[in-house]
Amino acid sequence: MALFCLSLFEEKQKPPSKETRHREQVKKPLKKKDSGVQVAKRDDRRAQEQKRDRDRPRDTFMPDTGKSLRVAILIDDIGQDMNALHELLEINAPLSFAVLPRQPHSAEAAKRIHLKNRDVLLHLPMEPKSYPEDRPGNGALFLSMTDKEIRTQFQRNLETVPHAKGVNNHMGSRFTEDTEKMLVVMTALKEKGLFFVDSRTTKDSKAREAADKIGVPFLTRKIFIDNDHNYQASLENLTRWLEDPGMQGNGPVLFIGHPYPSTILAIRDAVSSLRAKGIEIVPVSKIVPQ
């Protein structure tokens, strides 16, 4: 995963003023009057686009609720800083949380999340391509492990994160590219009745292929909220797709972020904007295809 090992104790960034939060409306230059031929061509293109929209298959797992889109916001790397978790749980939206195993507050965090009726996921550490420079942490899965060692490691991790409904990978750019190892992981998930969320730390991930073969419910991340670790960039990542027709009508959207102070502020400010647009914020488990 393209996660940055940045301090969770970074000083809170002050949010910009309301004036700087809102994008300036840029006036469009006046266009020259189109000729009859240009108008005809434009109308023809518009008709073709409308036909493609009508013919596009609907997502079978997204019920028609009358809302334009549903989104889930998953917060990774939970289990180290309980103060950050407390702030996130105070946000008036059903955020979901991926808890790292074998951390000082893994079990406590999972229990608190569950008591708040929010989704808990096991944030499963996996070997990245940058290992050993970047270490995935306690309970990590490595390609050098036997199948039995992977299953044992997974079970021990799961025991430290109670109430988990699913699993997503922490790092794992190397591990998730190995089909055979991912089949071992998916088999373990199938036995526990868990779903898998691919954080997509590599474009060559074999997670979907393995999940489909074993029959594990699967979902993939659409957008990382906070790659830039910056309030304004995070806020724009949460809202910019609303202006992109290509992203709407293609099923639910999964955002993944981290418990950074700037991300917490961005999510808090984005929630009302999303709802004002008719967007429904839901737990991750509600948008996983079954």
Annotate each PLM feature.
Residues 71-76, 95-97, 118-124, 167-169, ...:
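Hydrophobic faces of well-ordered beta-strands that scaffold small-molecule active sites
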Residues 1-69, 236-239, 244-246, 278, ...:
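Terminal interaction modules at protein C-ends
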Residues 189-201, 259-290:
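C-terminal domain-boundary segment and adjacent tail
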Residues 61-134:
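Active-site beta->alpha N-cap acidic-glycine motif
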Residues 155-175, 255-256:
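Active-site groove signature of glycoside hydrolases
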Residues 79, 91-94, 101, 149-163, ...:
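Extracytoplasmic beta-rich ectodomain segments of secreted or membrane-anchored proteins
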Residues 74-78, 96-102, 168-178, 190-204, ...:
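Catalytic beta/alpha-barrel core
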Residues 135-136, 140-159, 175-181, 208-246:
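Alpha-helical scaffold elements lining the catalytic groove of polysaccharide deacetylases
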